[in-house]
Amino acid sequence: MNFEFINIPVYLARLHFLDPLLVGKTKINKNDNCLDKIWLFKNSNEVHLLVNGILANLRTSIACEAGVIDACTWGLNEIMDNVIQHSEAECGFVMATIHKKTKNINICIFDYGIGIYRSLKKSTIHNPKNAPDAISLAVQEGVTRDKSIGQGNGMWGLYNIVNLNTGMMSIISGKGGLSLNRGVMRTFKEIQMLSQSQQATT
């Protein structure tokens, strides 16, 4: 099935919404702006280049309190690595934005893989009942599909970083969702999804 898009808003075109930037075809230099663009990544080397580029822009765009850059570094690496290790998708996508007036950093990481629920169902240890249950498990310490490829602390660590800084975080995967907003956590179910095999995670 092919789609034709007409009259694309200038803002979406500038973000590369329909044509994400490929790290392999775009040389990222230290002076390049990696923010406000959608990037596609396929492997750990591309993750490394993107994380370094995004963090370089963060440092020069906004004055961050102690520990913020380290937290962003850790969170980006962990969650983007989750895409490579667990999603079974060919690639993932990432975009980072800074709102200078509010001093907020927004980061979105997406993949169209099998989803957290189907990934954890392959585990011999964990047996989530549904997608919301799987997401709630994923933000607990030490939960992973396979201990040989990860310690299971990525989502848990990011959740705690956001929580301690009274930030906001949302996870949507398959039919389930979880939101954390200034210390208040909620889960959602029966979210619409396009494909049973590619449940996707954001």
Regions found by a protein language model. Give the residues of each.
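Flexible, glycine-/charge-rich segments associated with ATP-binding catalytic modules
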Residues: L22-D32, N45-E46, T124-K129, Q140-T202
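Acidic ATP/Mg2+-coordinating residue in the GHKL
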Residues: D111
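Conserved ATP-binding N-box helix of the HATPase_c
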Residues: A66-K101, Y159-V162
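Short beta-strand element(s) in the Bergerat
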Residues: K103-I107, T201
